[in-house]
């Protein structure tokens, strides 16, 4: 094994080549691999653990942990070397010496020294156990898996049987209780990891969470897990091997990054859906723009959005409306849409780099001293310094904050009728806008989420304090940064859930808009032909030429500017149709002087007839949409983004929201948020991209 490692090292002595190779391929393919790994029923610890494997075991699902049996020999060699070296009088840190700044002290009582290590490191506070001072069980499970993965590599001087016991606890879903706070992740996560050691050694203060959520002591924990042997009496170095590592910080970081990768992909797809419902211009995804910028994250983000928008029924309709009247909206969309690939691309690059950094960390040997059996020596170093965790988590959290900022900007445009290209204010879906304020509360909530998320974007790693008698004078704060990033992920999921519900509301509003517009055009056409086509004698009337302009007026007018009262003289529809008739009357010349040929004389009859029938037609169109019998089916069914809409509306059973119903936005958002926490959105997300070949559309 050592020879093979040296051979690889000579080929790539600084590991830059391997690090670069790990980032090859698309981010989408990387996410697909993560999801596939997450769903495997067995995780075998073979020194190639991924963040997805850690996240799967952390979730406490049916994923089983198996140790690589071939590791038993090298683990035993390392353990035996420690025992032999102590018997031979070798002076080794943490075996015959004190710890940290007091390592000048000496003892020959190796077992007692390990017991004392665990005792003095049990310095955490748990409160009542229910008031938020206990590390979540999922994070503890992640830490257990990562620590075992490190110790299996055979450089730490610990018995294989201890690792088997930790794996047994994992498989039985029995989780030691660890304090939420109290580690600086250098020299490793000493305080929290000491509670795992405390459980396997049977310390009286050790507690665990049973599969049913109850708290049990160490003896009950072993019994529930089916562990027959008693508690371990630690041999020299074994306590230090268990606590002197970065597993708690890197374990939680693994969980965080699994979600961050999925959520960043979701943000790309939601930007595409945002373009669809906003009648945006897909030109912003053109590959040449992004090719000339060179950044791979941006190029992929644009290509994914391009794929979502290619052939989209909404984009076809938006193009048609744009050709009808190029001045209906600005020449370019606002930055939240038009520069979304440029904004998201760097965040994806940061998250990918952090993912690989953490995967290197969870597969590293990160305790001290390291036992090199081949050279017969203990090497004193500092791999316990969790700087890759602190830095990666700070960077990831800043990326998450940036994604949330973009999402909030897009949401703010979506609910604002000055910017959303014809959708109602606050996405109000009811008949009476004076009694329906739609997503107004949701926008306030989104502002709150975004503000907190931007605060969390501040770094943790610049708040280092010198610790442990100035021995640990620089330290990574890895777990603290991981915890803050986990908070940020939670907030981004709240924002994503809220945005997704709002986008589905907008999709349904576009469906209603199209059906109401068609109904209005049909009604106006019928009324125009009835009242404007002929005079009292049945002769063709000049007013008949108004029909085309009347229909063009309807096409240009925002449906929700008049839908609640289509014949109101205060609303633009009737005003603009009247203006059409007046303009034709002014152009009618001398014929206007005679009542039989006057266009203006037809105006009152036209409006009177329209008032009699148009409100009924609009209500009928609205009712048909609500009943599922609309003449024009919802365009979303023809789009690549449909799986996400189907997930929210069909699978989760959320509703189109109106002030007339009792259902609140928060109730619907909560359904999506809970499902997102359970990972149920992932399949729908990936289905949106199942046809993408991993490349931008060719330039032509």
Curated annotation (Swiss-Prot):
Similarity comment: Belongs to the PAL/histidase family.
Biological role stated in the UniProt entry: This is a key enzyme of plant metabolism catalyzing the first reaction in the biosynthesis from L-phenylalanine of a wide variety of natural products based on the phenylpropane skeleton.
Free-text description of this protein's post-translational modifications in UniProt: Contains an active site 4-methylidene-imidazol-5-one (MIO), which is formed autocatalytically by cyclization and dehydration of residues Ala-Ser-Gly.
Gene3D superfamilies, sorted: Fumarase/aspartase (Central domain), Fumarase/aspartase (N-terminal domain), Phenylalanine ammonia-lyase 1, domain 3
Native species: Triticum aestivum
UniProt crosslink position (5-imidazolinone (Ala-Gly)): 186-188
Subcellular location: Cytoplasm
Protein name from the UniProt record: Phenylalanine ammonia-lyase
Catalytic activity: L-phenylalanine = (E)-cinnamate + NH4(+)
Gene Ontology MF: a single term: phenylalanine ammonia-lyase activity
EC annotation from Swiss-Prot or TrEMBL: 4.3.1.24
Assembly: Homotetramer.
